[in-house]
Amino acid sequence: MKDKLILAILQLPIVFAEPERNLAAAKEAMEAALCKSPHPDIFLLPELWLTGFFPSPIEQYAEDAVHAKEMMQTFAKMHGIYLVGGSLPIREKGAIYNRTFIFDRSGEEIAHYDKMHLFSPGGEKGVFTAGSSLATFSIEGHTAALAICYDLRFPELFRAL
């Protein structure tokens, strides 16, 4: 077990409904973080970094999300880092989920999590389908779990962990 893990929390200049620009900005921010000393073990991207909050119809960005996921896998493998992929609009079984992925140092997906508590005043319930299960995983011998934004307002989620 590694005693200390270094986390790079990446803030991006997200441009609404411009996935190509946002993808380039994410890659640039991650490459810049690689130059930091000490070298980060884990990179963390923000919620809906690819599209912004949330262009309509969000479904049109599902294919862009597939490409973003592939980029994250490749980046994690190429640079030997863990990558928590913020969240992306993912189409699965006829629904759209606000999903985050976790990739290990070899680029393998070790977990994913669908946001469980959608923010009604923000209109998320009209756009996304809520997730139904927690996601825990291990990083260098440390157990970790995920939540996305509004999820933090529900302590029962964290008690269940």
Where are these regions (language model features)?
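Short polar catalytic/cofactor-binding loops
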Residues: 11-17
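Active-site metal-binding loops of divalent metal-dependent hydrolases
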Residues: 12, 48, 152
